């Protein structure tokens, strides 16, 4: 619902705080169009799915044609976190720190069944899905996921980015500091 104020209609509190300083209608669509074709990936690779991820990122499948090319080596330069492989409880605070260091807007992809749900590692050391510690935008299941699934997932993420509003861009730091087992 919009808030009427002084003859103008504002879509959210965030847009109301911006006032007349920022145009948020057509400009948001143009910025989203540019963002969906320019992902800066930070790969957080911990297990065997990493080999398949390297295959997908290589020249045969060429993620560059979808705007997800050269990986960044600092989370401060990235806006797409690819979490690939099993996450242990000791790695969970590191993953949260990496997520919090990323620039806004940021997106997270859970790559592989171990990242999505813990996989076949149902024990006390494994995080049962990274969505218990950081927000996830896209799940790509599989052991390991087929390259076609990764490309399809990336196309779905591009569609999600295109439809985002200004309010969706501000996610903030992860409120969860440690992994909890469900």
Residue spans of the language-model regions?
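Short, acidic Gly/Pro/Ser/Thr-rich loop/turn segments
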Residues: 53-54, 89, 116
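A short, gly/pro- and small-residue-rich
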Residues: 94-109
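Short glycine/threonine-rich loop/turn motifs
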Residues: 121
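Iron-sulfur (Fe-S) cluster-binding modules
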Residues: 1-76, 102-106, 124-126, 132-139, ...
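Thiamine diphosphate
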Residues: 78, 83-96
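Short gly/pro/ser/thr-enriched loop/turn and capping motifs at secondary-structure boundaries
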Residues: 114-118, 147
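Hydrophobic cores of alpha-helical transmembrane segments in multi-pass integral membrane proteins
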Residues: 80, 110-115
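Short His-Asn-centered micro-motif
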Residues: 83-85, 111, 142
């Amino acid at each position: 619902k919009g808030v009427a104020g002084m003859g103008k209609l504002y879509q959210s509190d965030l847009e109301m705080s911006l006032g007349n300083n920022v145009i948020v209608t057509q400009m948001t669509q143009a910025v989203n169009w540019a963002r969906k074709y320019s992902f800066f990936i930070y790969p957080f690779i911990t297990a065997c799915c990493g080999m398949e991820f390297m295959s997908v990122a290589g020249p045969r499948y060429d993620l560059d044609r979808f705007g997800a090319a050269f990986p960044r080596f600092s989370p401060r330069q990235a806006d797409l976190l690819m979490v690939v492989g099993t996450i242990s409880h000791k790695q969970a605070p590191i993953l949260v720190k990496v997520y919090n260091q990323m620039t806004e807007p940021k997106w997270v992809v859970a790559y592989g069944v171990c990242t999505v749900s813990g996989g076949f590692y149902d024990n006390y050391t494994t995080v049962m899905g990274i969505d218990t510690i950081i927000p996830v935008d896209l799940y790509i299941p599989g052991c390991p996921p087929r390259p076609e699934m990764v490309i399809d997932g990336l196309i779905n993420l591009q569609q999600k980015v295109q439809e985002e509003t200004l309010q969706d861009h501000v996610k903030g730091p992860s409120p969860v500091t440690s992994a909890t087992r469900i």
